[in-house]
Design a protein with these regions (language model features):
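Structured beta-strand-rich core segments of catalytic domains in phosphoester-bond hydrolases
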Residues: 1-59, 167
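N-terminal, active-site-proximal structural segment of metallo-dependent hydrolase catalytic domains
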Residues: 5-6, 58, 80, 200-206
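Conserved hydrophobic/aromatic beta-strand scaffold that supports enzyme active sites
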Residues: 8-10, 46-50, 64, 152-153, ...
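Short, glycine/acidic-enriched loop or turn micro-motifs at the edges of active sites
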Residues: 16, 67-69, 103
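Metal-dependent phosphoester/phosphodiester hydrolase catalytic core
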Residues: 41-43, 52-80, 89
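Hydrophobic/aromatic residues located in beta-strands of well-ordered beta-sheets
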Residues: 62, 95-97
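Active-site metal-binding loops of divalent metal-dependent hydrolases
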Residues: 65-67, 99-101, 193
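Metal-dependent phosphoester-hydrolase catalytic domains
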Residues: 73, 77, 86-95, 103-206
Length: 206
């Protein structure tokens, strides 16, 4: 908060996963302390956690980030930074990377990650996909077509993706139209639709 920027939380089921270690780094030339990165408009962050699947020996690192919505250079450099972090990670574990990247699947930063030979786009490798509109909706329940898939999940080769889905649920509140008539208007909970995947580990089917 305040000058230290945002927080990219990782929610997990404590009945299924044990958190072993966690931390943050900032998407900037000074990753160990809060600060604007390159041409970014906001202070951006990546949160990580080392998890163990309870009842197994399988461990993995989960990264969750939020890239800047304005800075083109910031997004490109953030993609390079996260890949270097994963390559150099001391834990040497399977990894999952998710977040609001603010870049679509045609962007060079996206391709840098997906073509790295380390991480794979969950949408691309999923056995079953459900996605009928952009993940960015600008708070418009009707959505924005298919060009803005800017929220992504990437995984190392230690995982298979059984299902990939976009949750397009809306909620309704009572409002008044231009004629003074009460109507139920649809609203999205966020300006992004959440995406969800079902995965298996290649060594431990869970």
């Amino acid at each position: 908060g305040k000058k230290k920027g945002e927080h990219s939380a990782i929610f997990y089921d404590t009945n299924k996963f044990e958190l072993i270690e966690s931390g943050n780094f900032w998407l900037s030339p000074t990753p160990d302390r809060p600060g604007l990165g390159w041409d970014a408009a906001c202070v951006r962050i990546c949160t990580w956690g080392v998890f163990k699947i309870k009842g197994t020996k399988f461990k993995f690192v989960y990264y969750n980030l939020h890239m800047d919505h304005i800075g083109v250079t910031a997004r490109a450099e953030s993609a390079k930074m996260i890949m270097n972090r994963i390559k150099e990670d001391k834990h040497k574990l399977p990894a999952i990377l998710s977040g609001d990247f603010n870049i679509n699947q045609d962007n060079d930063g996206f391709k840098l990650i997906d073509n790295s030979g380390i991480l794979n786009d969950a949408y691309r490798i999923a056995k079953f996909r459900y996605l009928n509109m952009s993940t960015f909706n600008s708070f418009r329940p009707e959505g924005l077509g298919m060009d803005e898939r800017i929220d992504h999940i990437f995984l190392t080769n230690n995982f298979t993706v059984e299902k990939y889905g976009e949750l397009t649920d809306v909620y309704r509140t009572e409002s008044v139209d231009a004629n003074g008539k009460k109507v139920a208007r649809a609203h999205t909970p966020s300006d992004h639709y959440p995406i969800m995947i079902v995965v298996n580990t290649k060594k431990n089917k869970k």
